[in-house]
Amino acid sequence: MPLSKIKTNSLATGSITSAIMPTGSVLQVKFGKFDDDIANTTGTEQDVLSLTITPSSTSNKIYLTSHAQISSITRYHHIKLYRKIGSGSYSQIAFGDNSSETTRQTAWYCCSTGEVTGATYMQTNSAGFFLDEPATTSQFTYKITAGASSSSITGYAFTVNSAHYHGITQAQNQWWNTWPITTLTAMEIAG
């Protein structure tokens, strides 16, 4: 691969401006982590973490990655991704087309341990990836939520960043338990 030359007139006070960066360049990275734990006894959707980012151009895209640690002795759990522009309201993004099967829940990614032997002690590490095209230079916020696949489902308790132990949805300070993190990363990509 040939080397590229940076023109001196492209430099501003010793730095490379984002306007000069080629398409596909990473212009900024925002990272959020949730290093506490959540004990949810009902399965209802719950906020996990959020971050804000302000694109430098309307043509730029935002590449999002996330991984979450969920534990449960039941099933149907997922992560949803939401976006809010400025002080507006959140809208769900990054989900499949359920227009022909409207009973199915929309989600960014699933992270259920399922009802299997030993699921009580399992922590599932699941990940999601998404390229967003917000077409704005306003500040906006991304957030992820965890929950069961229906607001009408109750009793599908889960934990985030902790093992779910025999139906007790609280952090267990035991040698066999771990305390991982759940993350959300947003990268502005030159368009």
Q: What label would you give each PLM region?
A:
Residues G14, S25, T44-Q46, S57-S59, ...:
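Short, surface-exposed loop/turn motifs at beta-strand boundaries within globular domains
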Residues L3, G24-V26, T42-E45, S89-Q92:
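Tryptophan-centered short beta-strand motifs
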Residues P2-D37, G191:
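Glycine-rich, low-complexity segments
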Residues L49-I53:
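Extended, low-complexity regulatory regions
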Residues K33, I38-T41, S56-Q139, K143-G191:
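Terminal beta-strand-rich extracellular "head" domains
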